Amino acid sequence: MLYKDIKNKSTTELNDLIVELKAELFLLRFKNKTSQQEQTHKIQVVRKDVAKVLTALKEKQILGEKELINKIDKKEVKKNARKN
């Protein structure tokens, strides 16, 4: 899964994707412990995908907070300009 594809998804899609990936990770770990899985490298791949999705979510959260701060600052500047 490429990060640029993940980055373009909405927050709700990312949350749904995290749920799916964590469920898949649970099943892979379960199969690994019961010796039913032959391709153990898939666990690492899914873990990295979960990390990519969480990173994208955090990035969106930080950008949203910065936009909110910028809006508040602009409103304060306008209020101060009107007072003077």
From Swiss-Prot:
Gene3D superfamilies: 1.10.287.310. GO terms for cellular component: cytosolic large ribosomal subunit. The keyword Ligase does not apply. It comes from the Bacteria. GO terms for biological process: translation. GO terms for molecular function: structural constituent of ribosome. Keywords: Ribonucleoprotein, Ribosomal protein. InterPro entries: Ribosomal_protein_uL29 (IPR050063), Ribosomal_uL29 (IPR001854), Ribosomal_uL29_sf (IPR036049). NCBIfam families: L29. Belongs to the universal ribosomal protein uL29 family. This is Large ribosomal subunit protein uL29. It comes from Mycoplasma mobile (strain ATCC 43663 / 163K / NCTC 11711). The gene is rpmC.
